[in-house]
Amino acid sequence: MESYKCRVCFKSFVNGKALGGHMRSHMSNSHEEEQRPSQLSYETESDVSSSDPKFAFTSSVLLEDGESESESSRNVINLTRKRSKRTRKLDSFVTKKVKTSQLGYKPESDQEPPHSSASDTTTEEDLAFCLMMLSRDKWKKNKSNKEVVEEIETEEESEGYNKINRATTKGRYKCETCGKVFKSYQALGGHRASHKKNRVSNNKTEQRSETEYDNVVVVAKRIHECPICLRVFASGQALGGHKRSHGVGNLSVNQQRRVHRNESVKQRMIDLNLPAPTEEDEVSVVFQ
């Protein structure tokens, strides 16, 4: 935790407001001392320097700091109220130091460096830390930049490769059916027309084959064959007339068979009213 110390009496306070109220009491006391002539201060400073060289060195450093701050405050145009208060505090601090040296005792915290040196060290540390962080960030940025450059190069290479492929494939038109490549779109169109013609011719041949097969089936269905003599006729009328002939022939054959049967039956029967046949007489003579 940062401690707030008074530069005059070296008391520590909790916050800056308490320190400011304490410094106002010193300012009221030092206002009367500032009205004295500056020659007395220089004489006292010379006496103090002759009596104590260490304190003379510190007081001279503090005076130089006060003079430099007063000069810088004069050069700056827009001075703030805090800056003016700081210069007054430094002057009062110098006068208090001179008084203490004249009285002949030293403060316990005389060897401690002033607050300005501590602030300078802290600012230097902050600057060093900032520089270190910036260097790290810069290194990371360089690395990321390299990666970005590599990515851009790869993208450019891929784009160039694609352009080369497009240049090689440019002016070539490929047929989707047979896979042939043509230089112009017109040639590809003519080639596609030939494919269409082939498709039409194939469709026609398929239709013809289908019609022929249907005709064959119809012809096969229209064949008129005689079941008796296995003769084929073009129409059913011819086949009917042929079948009638087969019916007439069958009738004549049946009649002949019937006549032959009747004759055989008649031969087997003996009629006593009729004379004996001559053949039988001859047979009887032979047996005698």
Swiss-Prot record:
Keyword entries, A-Z: Metal-binding, Nucleus, Repeat, Transcription, Transcription regulation, Zinc, Zinc-finger
PROSITE patterns in UniProt: ZINC_FINGER_C2H2_1 (PS00028), ZINC_FINGER_C2H2_2 (PS50157)
Role summary: Probable transcription factor that may be involved in stress responses.
Regions annotated as coiled coil: none
Region (Disordered): 20-82, 101-123, 189-210
Species, as recorded: Arabidopsis thaliana (Mouse-ear cress)
Extent of Polar residues compositional bias: 37-52
A GO biological-process term: regulation of DNA-templated transcription
SMART domains on file: ZnF_C2H2
Protein name per Swiss-Prot or TrEMBL: Zinc finger protein ZAT9
GO molecular function, one term: DNA-binding transcription factor activity
Gene Ontology annotations for the cellular component aspect, listed alphabetically: nucleus
Subcellular location: Nucleus
InterPro entries: ZAT1/4/9, Znf_C2H2_sf, Znf_C2H2_type
Zinc finger (C2H2-type): 4-26, 173-195, 224-246
SUPFAM superfamilies registered for this protein in UniProt: beta-beta-alpha zinc fingers
Name of the encoding gene: ZAT9
